[in-house]
Each structure stands twice: as structure tokens, then as C-alpha cells.
Regions:
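C-terminal motif of bacterial Sec signal peptides marking the signal peptidase cleavage site
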Residues: 7-10
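Bacterial signal peptide processing site
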Residues: 12-15
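Post-signal peptide N-terminal segment of mature Sec-exported envelope proteins
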Residues: 20-40
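Contiguous beta-strand segments within globular domains
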Residues: 36-54, 63
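Noncatalytic modules at the cell exterior or secretory-pathway interfaces
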Residues: 44-52, 111-128
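Short acidic/polar inter-strand loop motif in beta-rich domains
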Residues: 56-59, 103-105, 125-134
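Short coil-to-beta strand junction motifs in C2/discoidin
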Residues: 61-67, 135-138
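An anionic, turn-rich surface loop/hairpin at beta-sheet edges
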Residues: 82-112
């Protein structure tokens, strides 16, 4: 019985990984609307990797999505990333995972960080050539323990 419980525990979901997603307005994501996340770290003694994830539907009009991502400690921006998601290939095929009308892509924006290094993340869609990006359904972060 103890062996079976140990095996079950070893196969259980990793409790130290967290994710947060924010739904985007149906009428589009405005350049003037930054998205802010407060990463949740399950164990302050571990180092973490953070991924930025986007979800879009098949009505998204562009081949890419270019974002500015600020990693902020308690007082200042510690790192600014320009992140470019290739949403579709040159033939118009959607990239990432998904089915039906919804797709998700993710990219690592921080690796092997201590929880005290990043207390908030702000995402801007300032790099796109339009004021309002439509058909991005959700923006999120995925925080997982570093493997290194």
C-alpha cells in the first residue's frame, strides 16, 4: 500500500508550477492597455523559468505578434524583452498547439531566476503597426521550476 501511494505521488501534477491567463477584450487589445502579471512562486527556495503564452483564434490577421515584455523587481525594470511570436508560417499555416479555432504559442522570457528577481511582468503590444490587435483571446505566463 505504501509503495502504491508513493508511486501515485510521483505521478501527480507538479504543485510548484503555476500559470495565469488574462482574457483579452472582444473588441481588441489596445496599445494603451498594458497587461500586468504578478508571478506566483510555490517555493521561494527554488529557481524558476517563466514562459509567455498567447492564445489566438483563426481570425487573427497577422503572421506574427510582436510584444515588449518588462520584467520588474520590487523597484525597477530589470530586463526588457522584445518578443516576436511567429503565429503562422509563410504558407499561412498556424503555428503552436491547438485544435478547432484556438491556438496557443509560448516562449521562454526568463530562465533560472529567483522569486525575488521578478515580482511583476508587464506586456505591451506597442510594436505592432496597428492601435488595436484583434483576435488574440488570452495572454498568460507559465512559471515552472528550473531544471538546471
Amino acid at each position: 500500500m505504501v509503495c502504491a501511494l508513493s508511486l501515485l505521488d510521483a505521478c501527480s501534477f507538479n504543485q510548484t508550477s503555476t500559470s495565469q491567463f488574462k482574457e483579452m477584450p472582444c473588441d481588441g487589445w489596445s496599445k494603451e492597455m498594458p497587461i500586468r502579471f504578478l508571478p506566483e512562486y510555490a517555493d521561494s527556495s527554488l529557481n524558476y523559468d517563466i514562459k509567455l503564452a498567447i492564445r489566438h483564434n483563426t481570425s487573427y490577421q497577422y503572421g506574427n505578434l510582436s510584444l515588449v515584455v518588462d520584467l520588474i523587481d520590487s523597484t525597477r525594470i530589470v530586463h526588457r524583452n522584445n518578443v516576436d511570436f511567429e503565429v503562422s508560417d509563410g504558407y499561412g499555416n498556424w503555428q503552436g498547439s491547438g485544435f478547432g479555432a484556438l491556438y496557443q504559442l509560448s516562449v521562454v522570457i526568463a530562465q533560472d531566476i529567483k522569486p525575488s528577481d521578478v515580482s511583476s511582468i508587464v506586456i505591451w503590444q506597442a510594436m505592432m503597426n496597428c492601435n488595436n490587435v484583434k483576435n488574440v483571446t488570452d495572454i498568460g505566463i507559465i512559471v515552472t521550476p528550473s531544471k538546471s
